[in-house]
Curated annotation (Swiss-Prot):
Keyword Disulfide bond: yes
GO BP term, pick one: metanephros development
Site (Implicated in sodium coupling): 43, 300
Modified residues annotated as Phosphothreonine in this record: 588
Residues that span the membrane, as ranges: 25-47, 67-90, 96-117, 140-169, 177-193, 203-221, 276-295, 310-331, 376-406, 423-444, 452-477, 482-504, 526-547, 646-663
Pfam families in the cross-refs: SSF
Glycosylation sites (chain numbering): 248
Protein name, as recorded: Sodium/glucose cotransporter 1
Activity regulation as described: Enhanced by the interaction with PDZK1IP1/MAP17; but unlike SLC5A2/SGLT2, PDZK1IP1 is not essential for SLC5A1 transporter activity. Possibly modulated by cholesterol binding.
Compartment list: Apical cell membrane
Keywords: Cell membrane, Disulfide bond, Glycoprotein, Ion transport, Membrane, Phosphoprotein, Sodium, Sodium transport, Sugar transport, Symport, Transmembrane, Transmembrane helix, Transport
Length: 665
């Protein structure tokens, strides 16, 4: 292997030690400080300028958002630091196939904006389980889904993001991982708890801009260093580590040579690491679950001013999703070229020396590039970008998780909870989540790092498909009823969780030491498993629904696609269940207009302002105003001109998606 592709930093055996000293200069530190000050300022501005005193205001930003913050926020909530670490790492290990995961989303943001969101808005819901309750009646599906979603957040999103953020801080600052995580979560929680959804969406928009600028600059540096695109394709295939045997260990050749199909998205259906049928069909099922039924994503769309803004926001997000292939996957591959011995290490002893885990160091591909290539000041900017993507993902998840908990679980435990109590419960729940997340970090830390991105995708493949099946059928097949949906979800969950537990018990193995899990269980690629699980769930739901009583149309107006334009009044299936709460006379306060209002103390005023609980000063809404508000919340009309504009853009986006897949296939 020609030594010219190796940077001098790698030849020293104590490479990681040098990296720690990198961000100890004035330029970098001042950039990071300025960045955090700006973020806090934006959060505070959103906190004082929007209504957070109502559940609709805190959780849905009062349905007043325009298209560009929605698009940016969809993108930022999706791209966490797990993407920077995971996508770049998989790129370094196996080429561009993981980029296909990002491009698949181009199709599904269109499906979300054009097919799913209109139904959710007409149903007038805040959370996804709430939609299923209106559609099927009964509470068991709603509670089951809320709990499952919270589990998925903790196991995949929160833990993976925190872990990859910690890798970064550790490489750049040399801080103890737990200290770093504590500081991060404190800042994140502060403006989620105080600001509500508007703060989250505005800070997301700011962070998307910073993320894109920073990663464009880094990609430029990386391609310049490697000598352009042609040289990049050529050198990647030759990026083989120098140390491949160690006394009695000799590593198999396929464990350290780049894959022959590194530059193809579609790979062999049987021997490929990303089989093409799995990438087209299996991944589409996961994308349907993630983009069209996941609380974090849908909540962004529900906060839009009107339907045209939803569609435009989705289209913007689709165009942004073209970028990760070029801004994350390819820089990860370049990192392997520049620091081959470090990133592509195969000997457990070498890997342990470079990144502390024996299974491989591809996870540090992106952080290494930042720390080694960027000049002072810009390096601080890139660290801010990583923190930005981590924090924006976490704030989105914290806000959505507290929405799920407050609206779907807490209201069942405390039937007569006041608006104020709900607001406080939602904020306290965020603190509980943070506690669980920190406790989960050591488990993720010890999960072999080489599997981080695969870990996220595979857990999604085991738990997501039944949810996707139920939502798809709920919207497009009005014959489906509650028993069918419930048992479909339960059976799907049992099959998925048994595969997940088996795989964790045996471990997924690595190239050096394959797992000894029974072939019949773990031998099926997780994307194929998603297809099988989805099919089983769909069949179960349909069969049980056809054997039981259908739901009368009067309960389904505007809840499924075939009845989406009906104007008749809908009798909600859950209408009878929500018995009106008798207000305790001692809870109601007679307000004498003449009596002077008691002045609150300074501390109490500050507390109320901080938590958005001070908004009792405005007049109460009249019945007519409430009806008008309800109409606004469920309105999906569009102006003809803008409808045409967004539709044309949607078609262009789909054409771009097809072209990208074909070009790199």
């Amino acid at each position: 292997m020609d030594s010219s592709t190796l940077s001098p930093a790698v030849t020293a055996t104590d490479a990681p030690i040098q990296s720690y000293e990198r961000i100890r200069n004035a330029a970098d530190i001042s950039v990071i400080v300025i960045y955090f000050v700006v973020v806090m300022a934006v959060g505070l501005w959103a906190m004082f300028s929007t209504n957070r005193g109502t559940v609709g205001g805190f959780f849905l930003a009062g349905r007043s958002m325009v298209w560009w913050p929605i698009g940016a926020s969809l993108f930022a909530s999706n791209i966490g630091s797990g993407h920077f670490v995971g996508l770049a790492g998989t790129g370094a290990a196996a080429g561009i196939a993981m980029g296909g995961f990002e491009w698949n989303a181009l199709v599904f943001v269109v499906v979300l904006g054009w097919l799913f969101v209109p139904i959710y808005i007409k149903a007038g819901v805040v959370t996804m389980p709430e939609y299923l309750r209106k559609r099927f009646g009964g509470k068991r599906i709603q509670i089951y889904l809320s709990v499952l979603s919270l589990l998925l957040y903790i196991f995949t999103k929160i833990s993976a993001d925190i872990f990859s953020g910690a890798i970064f801080i550790n490489l750049a600052l040399g801080l103890d991982i737990y200290l770093a995580i504590f500081i991060l979560l404190a800042i994140t929680a502060l403006y989620t708890i105080t600001g509500g959804l508007a703060a989250v969406i505005y800070t997301d928009t700011l962070q998307t801009a910073i993320m894109l600028v920073g990663s464009f600059i880094l990609t430029g540096f990386a391609f310049r260093e490697v000598g352009g695109y042609e040289a990049f394709m050529d050198k990647y295939m030759k990026a083989i580590p120098t140390l491949v045997s160690d006394g009695n260990i000799t590593v198999k050749e396929e464990c350290y040579t780049p894959r022959a199909d590194s530059f193809h998205i579609f790979r062999d259906p049987i021997t490929g690491d990303m089989p093409w049928p799995g990438l087209i069909f299996g991944l589409s099922i996961l994308a349907l679950w993630y983009w069209c039924t996941d609380q974090v994503i849908v909540q962004r769309c529900l906060s839009a001013k009107n339907m045209s803004h939803v569609k435009a926001g989705c289209t913007l997000c689709g165009y942004l999703k073209l970028l990760p292939m070029f801004l994350m996957v390819m820089p990860g591959m370049i990192s392997r070229i520049l620091y081959t011995d470090k990133i592509a290490c195969v000997l457990p002893s070498e890997c342990k020396k470079y990144c502390g885990t024996p299974v491989g160091c591809t996870n540090i591909a992106y952080p290494t590039l930042v720390v080694e290539l960027m000049p002072n000041g810009l390096r601080g900017l890139m660290l801010s970008v990583m923190m930005a993507s981590l924090m924006s993902s976490l704030t989105s998840i914290f806000n959505s998780a507290s929405t799920l908990f407050t609206m779907d679980i807490y209201t069942k435990i405390r039937k007569g909870a006041s608006e104020k109590e709900l607001m406080i419960a939602g904020r306290l729940f965020i603190l509980v989540l943070i506690g669980i997340s920190i406790a989960w970090v050591p488990i993720v830390q010890s999960a072999q790092s080489g599997q981080l991105f695969d870990y996220i995708q595979s857990i999604t493949s085991y738990l997501g498909p039944p949810i996707a099946a139920v939502f798809l059928l709920a919207i497009f097949c009005k014959r489906v009823n509650e028993p069918g949906a419930f048992w479909g979800l339960i059976l799907g969950f049992l099959i998925g969780i048994s595969r997940m537990i088996t795989e964790f018990a045996y471990g997924t193995g690595s190239c050096m030491e394959p797992s000894n899990c029974p072939k019949i269980i773990c031998g099926v690629h997780y994307l194929y498993f998603a297809i099988i699980l989805f099919a089983i769930s769909v069949v179960t739901v349909l069969v049980i629904s056809l054997l039981t009583k259908p739901i009368p149309d009067v309960h389904l107006y505007r809840l499924c696609w075939s009845l989406r334009n009906s104007t008749e009044e809908r009798i909600d299936l859950d209408a009878g269940e929500e018995e009106p709460v008798e207000e305790d006379p001692k809870d109601t306060i007679e307000i004498d207009a003449e009596a002077p209002q008691k002045e609150k103390g300074c501390f109490r005023k500050a507390y109320d302002l901080f938590c958005g609980l001070d908004q009792d000063k405005g007049p109460k809404m009249t019945k007519e105003e409430e009806e008008a508000m309800k109409l606004k919340m469920t309105d999906t009309s569009e102006k003809p001109l803008w409808r045409t504009v967004v539709n044309i853009n949607g078609i262009i986006l789909l054409a771009v998606a097809v072209f990208c897949h074909a070009y790199f296939a």
